[in-house]
Amino acid sequence: MKESVIEKTAMVFGQMNEPPGARMRVALTGLTLAEYFRDVEGQDVLLFIDNIFRFTQAGSEVSALLGRMPSAVGYQPTL
């Protein structure tokens, strides 16, 4: 049985021109999808997050917008 990889692929995209809140949620959305396929569907999952720097940079920008120091509590709790 030959199956295409694309049929078993879920992709979530976030661009650098999007607001920081949206960029910060992209990695968490991908993780949520991976957990769903693993826990609910019972499938094996391989999760890739390309350029994790975008995710951490967005977290710093959100902290700045909220008026908090990005490093006030150390690393972001989401890392």
From Swiss-Prot:
Catalytic activity reported? ATP + H2O + 4 H(+)(in) = ADP + phosphate + 5 H(+)(out)
Specify the domain of life of the species encoding this protein.
Answer: Bacteria
Asked if Hydrolase is a keyword of the record, the answer is no
Q: Name one GO molecular function term.
A: ATP binding
Q: What is its main location?
A: membrane
The way this protein sits in the membrane is described as:
Peripheral membrane protein
Subcellular location(s) per record: Cell membrane
Q: Which InterPro entries match?
A: ATPase_alpha/beta_chains (IPR050053), ATPase_F1/V1/A1_a/bsu_nucl-bd (IPR000194), P-loop_NTPase (IPR027417)
Alphabetical UniProt keywords: ATP synthesis, ATP-binding, Cell membrane, CF(1), Hydrogen ion transport, Ion transport, Membrane, Nucleotide-binding, Translocase, Transport
Has keyword Magnesium? Answer: no
What EC number(s) is this enzyme filed under? Answer: 7.1.2.2
Tell me which Gene3D superfamilies the record gives. Answer: 3.40.50.12240
Cite a GO CC annotation: plasma membrane
User: Quaternary structure per UniProt?
Assistant: F-type ATPases have 2 components, CF(1) - the catalytic core - and CF(0) - the membrane proton channel. CF(1) has five subunits: alpha(3), beta(3), gamma(1), delta(1), epsilon(1). CF(0) has three main subunits: a(1), b(2) and c(9-12). The alpha and beta chains form an alternating ring which encloses part of the gamma chain. CF(1) is attached to CF(0) by a central stalk formed by the gamma and epsilon chains, while a peripheral stalk is formed by the delta and b chains.
Which family does this protein fall into?
Answer: Belongs to the ATPase alpha/beta chains family.
Briefly state the protein's biological role.
Produces ATP from ADP in the presence of a proton gradient across the membrane. The catalytic sites are hosted primarily by the beta subunits.
- Name it: ATP synthase subunit beta
Species this chain originates from: Streptococcus downei (Streptococcus sobrinus)
Its encoding gene is what? Answer: atpD
